[in-house]
């Protein structure tokens, strides 16, 4: 009888445990990879994903993204297929906050989205030697970054993890092309945001971690380090648009109980 009672107690205790997220990034992380992995962990369909996107309230984002199966080196995962009109808008942080505030996103998702863009704005202000109010986002102010950040925030807050654990981030040298011309990897905004973040070098070239993704990780309170002791409940593999020949590709997402 005692054994039966203990088993029931253990099951009830497991059910009451709040789930956490573990993220491992052997080849880096980008905003679209965050969106993809979190969508898989949250178990949302493409129809549900479209509803989240529409809740942002930006007409150009309507019907712009689906999550599809994708494989690299015959290892299957998922990838976000994103189709957006080309823009030349250089948005200020205030304009982005106004978009978020006017959206129909849940309050928690709005707050997380704005924290991510605030971290990014502070980094850009440092890089360009101006005030946060004077920052004009280029790539990060484009529709895809608003999409990645807001949808990832909606999915993350829907899961509502007790803890968020992330591996140290891979870094490499190389050249990145952007609106400012040729930049060294990591790009300046990432360089500024890396303070306090554990990293390690990899045998590759180019951009492994995007500014949008790093700002989101910091805004979401990611704890960088080794695997925590946990029990895996579900997992997903998210691919980005870049394939590294010398690295294991994809980011691995895990829903766990601690």
Which functions belong to the PLM regions below?
Residues 9-15:
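Short, Lys/Arg-enriched N-terminal segments with co-localized hydrophobic residues
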Residues 15-20, 127-138, 172, 195-201:
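Glycine/charged-rich beta-loop-alpha catalytic/anionic-binding loops adjacent to active sites
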Residues 21-36, 137-159:
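Conserved phosphate/anionic-ligand binding catalytic regions in large, soluble enzymes, centered on
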Residues 23, 109, 135-139, 165-168, ...:
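General beta-strand structural signal in soluble alpha/beta enzymes
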Residues 34-39, 149-156, 190, 213-220:
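Buried hydrophobic packing segments
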Residues 40-128, 187-200, 204-207, 211-214, ...:
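Glycine-rich nucleotide/cofactor/substrate-binding loop typically near the N-terminus or early
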Residues 44, 161-257:
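Mobile "lid/hinge" segments at catalytic clefts and subdomain interfaces of large enzymes
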């Amino acid at each position: 009888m005692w054994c039966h009672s203990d088993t029931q107690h253990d099951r009830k205790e497991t059910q009451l445990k709040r789930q956490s997220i573990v993220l491992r990034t052997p080849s880096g992380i980008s905003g679209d990879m965050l969106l993809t992995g979190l969508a898989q962990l949250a178990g949302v369909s493409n129809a549900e994903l479209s509803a989240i996107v529409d809740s942002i309230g930006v007409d150009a984002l309507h019907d712009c993204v689906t999550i599809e199966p994708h494989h690299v080196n015959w290892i299957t995962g998922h990838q976000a297929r994103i189709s957006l009109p080309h823009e030349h808008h250089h948005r200020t942080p205030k304009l982005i906050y106004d978009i978020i505030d006017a959206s129909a996103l849940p309050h928690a998702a709005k707050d997380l989205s704005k924290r991510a863009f605030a971290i990014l704005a502070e980094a850009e202000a440092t890089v360009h030697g101006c005030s946060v109010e004077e920052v004009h986002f280029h790539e990060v102010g484009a529709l895809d970054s608003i999409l990645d950040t807001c949808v990832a925030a909606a999915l993350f807050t829907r899961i509502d993890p007790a803890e968020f654990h992330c591996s140290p981030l891979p870094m490499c040298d190389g050249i990145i092309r952007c609106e400012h011309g040729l930049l060294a990897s990591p790009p300046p905004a990432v360089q500024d945001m890396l303070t306090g973040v554990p990293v390690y070098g990899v045998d590759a070239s180019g951009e492994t971690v995007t500014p949008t993704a790093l700002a989101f990780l910091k805004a979401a309170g990611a704890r960088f380090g080794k695997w925590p002791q946990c029990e895996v409940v579900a997992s997903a593999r998210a691919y980005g648009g870049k394939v590294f020949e010398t690295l294991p590709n994809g980011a691995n997402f895990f829903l766990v109980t601690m």
